[in-house]
Each structure stands twice: as C-alpha cells, then as structure tokens.
Amino acid sequence: YPIVCTTKRTVSKKYKGGVSDYNKIKRELTMLCKSHPNEHVTTMFDYYAMPENTPEIGLHDPDIYERIGKIEAAVNRDIGQANCMFHFMLHEFEGILFSNPESFELIAETDVVNKIREIRESYPTPEHINNSPETAPSKRLEKLIPNYAKIKNGTLISKDMGIDKILAECPHFREWI
C-alpha cells in the first residue's frame, strides 16, 4: 500500500509536495525505510525543480536517462538504506500525460489536442518534454487548458490512456515499474 511522504510537519498538520530541501526528503525516507525494513520504499518525485542540495542534481549529462540514473544512484547511496529505491519522474508527472495526446479529448477541444500532439511529436519521448520553468509539461498544459486541474484532470487522462501506453512511451517510468 502506498504511504505518502510528508515534506513538512507541524504539531497539527503534515504537508506533501513542494519540496524545498533535500534533507527533508532524506529524513522522511530514512525513517520510512527503517520503519518498514522488510518492504521496498520507492518514490515518485518530480525531477523538475528539485532542491539544489539534492546529491548530483547539478549534473549536465546530455543524455537525460544517463543523468537521471546517476542522480538516483547518488541519492540512494546518500540515503543508505538497502530497501530504498529513489525514483524521479522525468520531468514531472504531467510529462507522462503526453504519452497519448488523444486522451486529452476528454477535457479539451480538437485544436488544443492537436497542439498537445505537436508538442509530443517534437520530442523523442514524453519524458524529454521540458525546456525551462515556463515550458515544463504542467505549465504547457495550464497555458493550453486554462481550467486544467492537475489532480482531477491528470487522473482522468492517465486512466483513459492506460498504463500500457505510458510504459510504451516512457522508458524511465517503465524501468521503475
């Protein structure tokens, strides 16, 4: 069963998302790994906008898969728990939604779906879609679909396209699964 990792704790509330410090991630994952020593602990953090103090995050290997593999390995070494398998989404969850542009027909007009298809066809895989903070997959979707709701629409679209389509289009995600 999934456990949602918290990124901040107060006396009255736990927070998730919006990671500002790698050490918070490390602390939470180390605690989870030690609390569940006979279970695998994995993550689904967005690579886009990870904190600067994440091990090896500054690597600039031109091959995104080589780069992300090195960063994930460095994080796993730093956490130092045998049952931890750190995984980054390339570049963020919304990237995998570009696996099947036709699924956007559920929430968008044909002209928008065509623009999403054009974006997808401009990259080797959906995992390559990201040029800058302004052109991250979620930013592109929010620009094209003004009422785009990340959780609601992302869930609807990913369910429509199905896991097999995502696995076929996204090698890093497939390797993780």
Give the positions of each predicted feature.
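C-terminal accessory helical subdomains adjacent to catalytic cores in phosphodiester-
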Residues: 1-12, 26-177
